[in-house]
Amino acid sequence: MENKKTIYFLCTGNSCRSQMAEAWGKQYLGDKWNVYSAGIEAHGVNPNAIKAMNEVNIDITNQTSDIIDANILNRADLVVTLCSHADSVCPSTPPHVNRVHWGFDDPAGKEWSEFQRVRDEIGERIKCFSETGE
């Protein structure tokens, strides 16, 4: 089924939030959506994001930290910004691309429990989207 839609998760560094969103997206949306993530910059995948996702049996060790790809951005059906910085500085999207903002706290540099909380919040949000389309 190659009539999949494309969802593109964006945050500042493509290190934590968007990496987790990509993983949850593949889990909950993978049969209907091509799921990608990127950042305004590429900071590398945060080891605590890898560890947090491992706790829920999702392996993101092979995910890469990438800057926004104009080709994916321009052909995406849905672009989701995950932080206010990405929302404000994200390159403009064409009129046919639906763009929404789902804000989540940045766990980088914070306590371990923050990674777990943000991971769970992102997972719940994407699960809800998979069930309701919103």
From Swiss-Prot:
Its main location: cytoplasm. GO terms for molecular function: arsenate reductase (thioredoxin) activity; protein tyrosine phosphatase activity. InterPro entries: Arsenate_reductase_ArsC, Ptyr_pPase, Ptyr_pPase_sf. GO terms for cellular component: cytoplasm. Catalyzes the reduction of arsenate [As(V)] to arsenite [As(III)]. Belongs to the low molecular weight phosphotyrosine protein phosphatase family. Thioredoxin-coupled ArsC subfamily. This is Arsenate reductase. It comes from Bacillus thuringiensis subsp. konkukian (strain 97-27). The lineage of its organism: Bacteria, Bacillati, Bacillota, Bacilli, Bacillales. The gene is arsC.
